[in-house]
Structures are given as C-alpha cells and as structure tokens.
Amino acid sequence: MENAFKSHLQFTEKAIKKIKNLIEIEKNHDLKLRIYINGGGCSGFQYQFIFDTSINEDDIIITQSEVSLIIDPISLQYLYGGQIDYLENLEGSKFIVYNPNAKNTCGCGSSFSI
C-alpha cells in the first residue's frame, strides 16, 4: 500500500536531504528507510531505523520528495501524525521522531511511552 498514509507520517526537509545523501553514498537507489517500533529503551518503546530493500506484504510505503519510508501497520499506529527529522548537534547526528502520541519521551529521544 503506497502513499495512502502520507499525511499520517511525514519527513522534514533535513531528513529527506540526509536520506538522499545516504542512498547516494550506498549507490543503491532501491534503498528505503524502514522505521519500526521495538519494546525497550528507558520509556518502554524504541524507534528503530534501518535501510531496507525488501518489502513485506503488509508493509506501508510512504513516499515524499522521492524518498520512501517503509513501515509496518502496527508501528504506524504508534506513529500516526508524527514527523521524522534529522538532527545534527554537538552530541552527534541521528534521525528523530516527533510523535504526538507519546505521553513520555526519554531524554535522548529514542524511546517513548504511550
């Protein structure tokens, strides 16, 4: 299922630029960013990001500015209305999620609770 959920999870321009850059470095234009939720972290759930070329039957693909995100339906329900950004600062660089569904978020921003 592609783009039916585009308005439910979006990328910032910084995230799009970084994803495109990483795909260029890998020289594999079939790569898509997969986000999924795992149990763990200090707040109960953790965001996980990987580049992937395989798409499962129930995966949802969201494409924005020629960048594709793969997400499974269960993870999407936790991220509904969210935004993926890319942050660079003195502490390092990482993809982060602005999640309107999170009741609590840990200080590093990589885990949350609902």
Swiss-Prot record:
Pfam families attached here? Fe-S_biosyn
GO CC term (a single one): cytosol
Query: Where does the source fall among the domains of life?
Result: Bacteria
Q: Identify the cofactor(s).
A: iron-sulfur cluster
In its UniProt record, a GO molecular function of this protein is: iron ion binding
Keyword field contains tRNA-binding: no
Q: Which UniProt keywords apply?
A: Iron, Iron-sulfur, Metal-binding
Q: Which residues bind iron-sulfur cluster?
A: 42, 106, 108
Q: Does the keyword Iron apply?
A: yes
Q: Which cysteines are joined by disulfide bonds?
A: none
Family, similarity comment: Belongs to the HesB/IscA family.
Q: How does it assemble?
A: Homodimer.
The task this protein performs is described as: Required for insertion of 4Fe-4S clusters for at least IspG.
State what protein this is by name.
Iron-sulfur cluster insertion protein ErpA
Q: What's the source species for this entry?
A: Buchnera aphidicola subsp. Acyrthosiphon pisum (strain APS)
Q: From the UniProt record, report the name of the gene that encodes this protein.
A: erpA
